[in-house]
């Protein structure tokens, strides 16, 4: 019988971890770490140990890394600044840089601790926002159809910048210049949430297209960005278990987009398919077909035609 891998999971009280933990518990021997022991609803996460991975004294949490085969880094600390969540029209956005720097320092601590402990691989949650300038400036303007992980990671906000920093920092550790090659897989997660049409007909909670864009424009966008629960589970399993994640230059470092096989996708899955063997099972156009017909394509559709846009 094959030995169960030991996986350290950070940020286990968060939303994405909540979707993954049941499957992870079945497949691996887990070590669970977060800065708090309860999830968003105040429920205790079984098995979690409280530790602050952003603290500069890595000896405080080195024990969690020792003997682990892989680290799944989902930890994130939101900046202590009130923001509206509306891209391009958020007066609080300028004040988020220091908070995001703390998250970059946490990523550094994770990479360094993994390297020191002999961990083979770190799988880190990056974000589609690591290169969201292309989406904001080009995709929704009809000037570009697809964004690839091979494109220079350019973001127009500090959250996206910090995620791009995770990626480039990971390359330093994967390059072998620090003594050995730490394998690093970066997951640019899309929209791992419900994107049914009713969410987009009222007041928007988040705005990803452009300030003042319609809810239906955001509905189309999120249909392209959607990541189903089972595709999320598959992607993470493959990121942890794939034997060889070396790129064409022999460096074990890969950036992949985390979306389902969506008809309206505008992010490339090429590296996820080629390197990880990811084979998405779901498509938002099918999963939310009733809303697509009602709002976008039926006789009473409220939106103009086109894959994206209002």
Residue ranges and their predicted role:
Residues 46-47, 51-105, 113:
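NAD(P)H-binding glycine-rich loop region in Rossmannoid oxidoreductase-like domains
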Residues 130-132, 158, 175, 179-206:
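Flexible, glycine-rich beta-alpha linker
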Residues 5-27:
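N-terminal Rossmann NAD(P)H-binding glycine-rich loop of SDR-like oxidoreductase domains
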Residues 103-110, 119, 162-170, 232:
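Conserved catalytic Lys-bearing alpha helix of Rossmann-like short-chain dehydrogenase/reductases
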Residues 90-101, 135-183:
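Catalytic helix-loop patch of NAD(P)-dependent Rossmann-fold dehydrogenases
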Residues 192-195, 200-217, 224-252, 261:
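Alpha-helical substrate-binding/gating segment
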Residues 108-156:
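Conserved Rossmann-fold NAD(P)-dependent oxidoreductase catalytic core, especially the SDR/UDP-sugar
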Residues 245, 252-279, 294-306:
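Conserved C-terminal active-site "lid" loop/helix of NAD(P)H-dependent oxidoreductases
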């Amino acid at each position: 019988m094959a030995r169960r891998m030991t996986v350290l999971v950070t940020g286990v009280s968060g939303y994405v971890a909540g979707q993954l933990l049941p499957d992870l518990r079945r497949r691996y021997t887990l070590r669970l770490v977060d800065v708090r022991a309860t999830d968003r609803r105040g429920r205790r996460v079984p098995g979690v140990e409280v530790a602050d991975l952003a603290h500069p004294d890595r000896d405080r949490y080195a024990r969690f890394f020792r003997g682990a085969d892989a680290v799944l880094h989902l930890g994130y600390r939101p900046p202590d600044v009130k923001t509206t969540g509306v891209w391009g029209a958020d007066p609080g956005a300028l004040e988020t840089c220091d908070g995001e720097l703390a998250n970059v320092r946490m990523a550094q601590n994770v990479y360094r601790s993994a390297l020191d402990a002999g961990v083979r691989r770190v799988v880190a949650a990056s974000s589609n926002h690591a290169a969201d300038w292309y989406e904001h400036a080009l995709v929704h303007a009809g000037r570009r159809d697809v964004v690839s992980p091979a494109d220079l990671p350019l973001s127009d906000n500090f959250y996206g910048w910090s995620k791009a920093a995770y990626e480039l920092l990971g390359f330093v550790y994967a390059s072998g210049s620090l003594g050995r090659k730490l394998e690093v897989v970066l997951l640019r997660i899309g929209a791992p949430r419900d994107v049914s049409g009713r969410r987009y007909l009222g007041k928007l909670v988040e705005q990803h297209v452009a300030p003042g864009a319609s809810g239906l424009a955001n509905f189309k966008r999120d249909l392209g960005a959607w990541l189903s629960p089972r595709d999320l589970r598959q992607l993470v399993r493959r990121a942890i278990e794939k034997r060889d994640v070396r790129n064409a230059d022999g460096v074990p470092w890969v950036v992949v987009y985390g979306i389902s096989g969506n008809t309206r996708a505008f992010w490339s899955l090429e590296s996820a398919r080629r390197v990880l063997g990811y084979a998405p099972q779901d498509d938002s156009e099918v999963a939310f077909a009733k809303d697509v017909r009602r709002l976008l394509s039926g006789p009473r559709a409220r939106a103009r035609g086109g894959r994206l846009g209002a």
